[in-house]
Regions:
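Structural beta-strand/beta-sheet cores of well-ordered domains, especially the beta-sheet scaffolds
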Residues: 99, 183-187, 286-288
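N-terminal alpha-helical "arm" segments
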Residues: 1-39
Length: 312
């Protein structure tokens, strides 16, 4: 007697290739487990990139320009001082990031699901590496960010990492521009620094030791000093760390493909964007090609909300 409910029928490689939206969902699930770019920037809207570019303004001082005058005591019937401000409108172009991976006719014929899933995983990994590297490079290239050295290498167990981070937080707060350094800021590190944080004696002494979610027990670093999170990536140098207020530092907006282009997309929701997928035939040899793409425009709008810590 059959059990109820019956198991779902196994799907074949050939059937998957006819469902590009499902491939898009798989890629989104794999990409956004590791990609940090959506955590660095505030997500914009498709309307912001209509026409292939996003217009933005770099943050100004919260005060008026002092020339020709500032607030002052004014005598009766005397002229009042006047101060204005300047605005500069900039444009960030939409970039087309994409890659294709072939699925051979033999893999389809033999239903080699392992080859198909490896192709998906490798495509997702390449998208993550490329997009995150571009985002980090954009942050570091902005002349308006602040750079400060670490007190000592974070590879040394006794280095006061908390002091280095809080100094960077104070730098952000000290801009007096409404940035949050001590509440919800994001710390970005190379993945090799995870082990150094776990071994750091200053952090061990400061963080709870008896809790079930304690970092040495779980292997997951708990945020400290008011941080909203710690993001680990291979896209930043091992001797660098970035602290930023992700709610204002920059904006990333995505241009959707035109329906006539034949791409399919699965919307993952939240701050994430769809990885658009197109499957088409290649006759020499008789392969199927999976193309995955994303069209972002990224702008650093508040470089004062970013601090680069060197020598970690």
């Amino acid at each position: 007697m059959p059990t109820y409910p019956q198991a779902s029928p196994a799907i074949s490689v050939q059937a998957l290739l006819k469902q590009p939206q499902r491939i898009s969902r798989d890629l989104a699930n794999m990409v956004y487990q590791r990609m940090i770019s959506p955590r660095l920037f505030l997500k914009g809207t498709p309307e912001q990139v209509a026409g292939g570019g996003m217009q933005f303004q770099v943050a100004e001082s919260i005060f008026l320009d002092l020339a020709p005058g500032d607030v002052e005591e004014i005598a009766t019937r005397a002229d009042w001082p006047r101060a204005g401000w300047t605005e500069a409108l900039k444009t960030a172009a939409v970039k087309q990031f994409g890659l294709e991976v072939p699925i051979s006719n033999l893999a389809i014929r033999r239903n080699a699901m392992d080859q198909f899933t490896r192709g998906e995983r490798k495509l997702a990994n390449n998208i993550v590496r490329f997009v995150d590297t571009a985002s980090i490079a954009l942050l570091l290239a902005d002349p308006g960010i602040t750079t400060q050295p670490a007190s000592a290498a974070w590879t040394v167990a006794g280095t006061d990492i908390i002091a280095d981070v809080t100094l960077a937080q104070e730098t952000i707060e000290g801009k007096n521009n409404g940035y949050n350094g001590f509440f919800g800021a994001l710390l970005v590190l190379n993945i090799t620094r995870r082990d150094d944080l776990l071994k750091n004696t200053v952090l061990r002494a400061a963080l709870p030791r008896e809790a079930n979610d304690q970092q040495v027990r779980t292997g997951t670093m708990l945020p400290f000093a008011g941080l909203g999170g710690i993001a680990f990536t291979t896209s930043i140098a091992a001797n660098q760390a970035i602290l930023l207020d992700p709610t204002v530092a920059g904006t990333i907006a995505y241009e959707p493909p035109d329906p006539a282009e034949g791409f399919s997309s699965y919307e993952p929701g939240g701050d994430f964007a769809a990885i658009s997928v197109k499957v088409y035939d290649e006759n020499r040899p008789k392969d199927k090609i999976i193309a995955g793409g994303i069209w972002p425009a990224t702008a650093i709008t508040d470089p004062g909300a970013v601090v680069l810590i060197t020598g970690v």
